[in-house]
Amino acid sequence: FSQKHHLALEMGTEKAQVYTSFFYEKNQGIALQDERQDYGGRVNASFKLFDDWLEVRPAVDYRQAARNNHYPNFQQAMRNNPTRSPYDPDSETGYNVWINESLDYNVVADAMLEDYYGLDKWFKPEVNLKLNIKPIPGLNYQQVVGYENRQWELHQYWPSTHRSEIDNSRKGHAHLAFSKTENLTSEGYFSYVKDFKGGHNLNATAGYSYFEVNGENFG
């Protein structure tokens, strides 16, 4: 099952335009504890300043995805005895946890008693600057600066009542993981275009490009 919502807004004048879009999306799988929620937005703009000497085009993009994925074993569910209830109203969890049987276990209890939460985040701002050197037709300078940040978080928890904890005589355990990647880009160049009589033209470009990547993680 899924639902999607989108909203877009646009406004502007001859010298300034702004476009924004936002979205929300939720997907829920057939299996228990299998769903995902996404939301995000993007803003683009364009401005002409100082009698068109300077053009500024910023853009910002953000997205977030929250995941709950348990990857239930459908094959195991098909092998289970259909007369054996996965629920037990007398247990503290409400589930019938079958133990010490590696080939016959309650996939419903396994999924419902484990906590899984994964979170993806993307953030990407960028700005493009163009300087038109009007006294010299055809000459301009462009500068692009961009940044990208991506993060991933994972939270998992198995309580003492989970089958894996009972089988291994544990009182529950948790797992936390995190990773972050950052990219930085900077490019700048002069461009000159001149047309001559007879169909000839001159096109010259000179500039630089810089890229940097950093990251960290654990778990």
What are these model-derived regions, one by one?
Residues 116-147:
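Charge-patterned, long linear interaction tracts outside catalytic cores
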Residues 46, 126-130, 187-191:
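Short, acidic/charged, Gly/Pro-enriched secondary-structure junctions
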Residues 148, 166-167:
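Glycine-centered small-residue hotspots that permit tight backbone geometry or close packing
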Residues 41-43, 143, 186:
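Extended, hydrophobic alpha-helical segments in both membrane/secreted and soluble proteins
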